[in-house]
Amino acid sequence: MALVLDDRVKETSTTTSTGTLSLSGAVSGFQTFVAGIGNSNTTYYAIVNRDEAEWEVGLGTVTDASTDTLARTTVISSSNSDSAVDFSAGTKDVFATLPASKVGFLDGSNNFIVGKGAAGVDYT
């Protein structure tokens, strides 16, 4: 099981509760999690309920089955005080993402910043 990142991975789901999501297929112009991430691999995900103020970002595991699934393994941030969201009814957009807390980048002063923090190392 590898950690895989890919572009333009987005599906919908109508799953409720805090458990594993059943994925409903790729949104037009995007690929499925199985096509982009692969069976049994992990990826960072975001889930956004279109009808409610519910969202979650985390690390999940993709399963290729008659109905593909995304297991919500580790919640990184959410609308539920950074705990698993008990999603209400309605359509959710589910997509691969790279959480801000996992990113390293150079700021305008060439300081290397990790995550959302303001401290870093000067590489000039």
What would you call each of these model-derived segments?
Residues 13-15, 37, 52, 62, ...:
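A generic structural signal for short, solvent-exposed coil/turn residues
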Residues 52-54, 110, 123:
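Residue-level signal for glycine
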Residues 34-59:
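Ser/Thr/Gly-rich low-complexity blocks that favor extended beta-strand/coil architectures
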Residues 43, 62, 119:
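Functionally constrained cores in energy, signaling, and assembly domains
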Residues 1-30, 67, 76-121:
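Glycine-rich, low-complexity segments
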Residues 53-71:
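Elongated alpha-helical scaffolds
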